[in-house]
Amino acid sequence: MMTTATVLVELLTEELPPKALPRLGETFAAKVFEGLKARDLVAEDRGFRCFAAPRRLAVTVPTVRAAAPSREVTEKIMPVQVALDAEGRPTPALLKKLQAKGIAPEAVASFERRVDGKAEALFYTHLEPGAALDDVLAAIVQEAVKALPIPKLMRWGAGDAQFVRPVHKLAMLHGARVVPGRVLDLDAGRVTMGHRFMSRGEIELATAEAYEPTLLAEGKVIPDFAERRSNIERQLVATAQEQGASLGEYADLLDEVAALVEHPTVYVGEFELEFLAVPQECLILTMRANQKYFPLFDAAGKLLNRFLIVSNMRLADPSNIVAGNQRVVRPRLSDARFFFEQDRKHTLDSRLPRLAPVVYHNKLGSQLERVERLERLAGRIADRLHGDVAAASRAARLAKADLVTDMVGEFPELQGIMGRYYALNDGEGEVVADAVQSHYQPRFAGDTLPAGNTACAVALADKLDTLVGFFGIGQLPTGDKDPFGLRRAALGVLRILIETPLPLDLAALVGDAAEGFAPGLLTAADFESQLLDFMFERLRNLLREAGHAVDVVDAVLALHPTRIDLVPAKLDAVRVFRGLPEAEALAAANKRIVNILKKAEDELPEPDVALLQEQAEKALFHAVVEVAPLVHSHVANEDYTDALCALAGLRAAVDTFFDDVMVMVEEPLTRRNRLALLRQLAGLMNQVADLSRLSA
């Protein structure tokens, strides 16, 4: 049995982009593994280890052969009538083909003859040597490098190599042996480097298996990203507990910091208490975004004047590190305090004229024009909700004013948040201030929704103005490109309508939003219908992701219910109906009715009882007349489950009708009357959902 060993590949680089590091590491490792496996060099699939640190990408793959085993290969040579003459001797065409493939003419005697398609052909079976690791590893690594998700490549030095950052060393080992090869203008070896400051000089790797322990012991580097992240998290949690504090939300920052340090150590820093007079969101953002610090909070979630530093150094006396970080953060906090103090000198109302030169979109006008649309639309929505029209209009008027404040200019992520602080500073009521802050919500999947009718009215106005505006000028999302966030806006509208819930008609809301634009501005043909179709497609995906059955969702949405808040109740009703013994037969009958009615005239009269001839059609007519008031009453009262359950009483009459009655008879009056009866039946059955969409 051929012996196997672990393969190591490491690219030693300059500092890699931190936010891209995990994906770079995972992709590089996976592609190297796939390349080895595709060439049958992996004897036993035990997966692989991925290593990604600020200055290295690496992978180890166990049980790799030095050479893949030979394999039996059968290839078609050519049709017999072309390959052999009448006496069975090789033709010149066959001899030429054999020479090109390096096959001796004597081998023809061993060729197999078999039918291939319509003609008989010659087939040659032979052993093909497997790939040698030494011959292919460099090519595999090069393929992995090319497959990395790198938007921009760079060159360095005098060579032609290109990568996301300069690469200085290449290690390729198979067990204890260096695998020869050249990648990115570098010859493979067994040398790597450790921590930039805590290790000295080059480190020689004895074996591929020794990669991680050698880097840990000699290089002072934790090369495994997940282990490094866990190490940092353990230190952060333990240190926060020692401080009697909590960390708040930290997952995204933890990922970024884990990509910035090789040997993490957590220290505690602090800043002056006076800075806590600044809104804590400002301080938190500047510490996290600019300094990569982890703010600390008390049990109530209030910011403390302490923070955690993840250093790339472990020192017996860290006082200089702590003092240096405290010194660096102070000007940042001072800037935030200055912005806050300056911004409060001017009311949000007084800032509105400064929105006039701020372009929202070159075809949709300025931010000030948009504010005027939002003010009108939010008031209209609040009126539909029988809410506080004045508060909604006022909040919408002020909603974008913080865009021209110093604080939001420095930290765009604080838009809305700072608007609330400044609105309260100006003497606005809590309801208006809260609506100013929350009108951007939900910003992402799972985000909280605005609370209260006023906040919902402003949030809906903001999103509907965006959707109607961009659909109205023909700027629709395409593929994975959505530069104006229209999918996010659509989901926000749907979530607010469903989860709050709000008794608003989506089509009416779209119409209200469209009326706010200047005449002739929205020129795209049929954009309102396009937008509603887009919204229903988003709703379809939203409901499926929530776990609703595909056919149930399709049945409800087939009727384009514009009262989105009622959709969950309709889904529940259809799900209950589907469990009834009569459901399958009624759904099948509904499908049959739909197909029959496709052949009918567009205009059909009400069914005429005098034209009913067969007992079965009379029975169906009377059953429909009897059930219809009950169904209509339940639908009017939004009791959709009872409405659908009432349909169960129609099953016997429907079954008998289709067994005994021919609909498409020659006599036109009878045919039209029976079609009219079926149309009436379909209208009754499909008030809540299109039951023909239900699967068996």
UniProtKB/Swiss-Prot annotation:
The keyword Ligase applies. It is found in: Cytoplasm. It catalyses: tRNA(Gly) + glycine + ATP = glycyl-tRNA(Gly) + AMP + diphosphate. Its EC number is 6.1.1.14. It is an enzyme of class 6 (ligase). GO terms for biological process: arginyl-tRNA aminoacylation; glycyl-tRNA aminoacylation. GO terms for cellular component: cytosol. Gene3D superfamilies: Isoleucyl-tRNA Synthetase, Domain 1. It comes from the Bacteria. Its main location: cytoplasm. Keywords: Aminoacyl-tRNA synthetase, ATP-binding, Cytoplasm, Ligase, Nucleotide-binding, Protein biosynthesis. One of its GO terms (molecular function) is glycine-tRNA ligase activity. Tetramer of two alpha and two beta subunits. Belongs to the class-II aminoacyl-tRNA synthetase family. HAMAP family: Gly_tRNA_synth_beta (MF_00255). This is Glycine--tRNA ligase beta subunit. The gene is glyS.
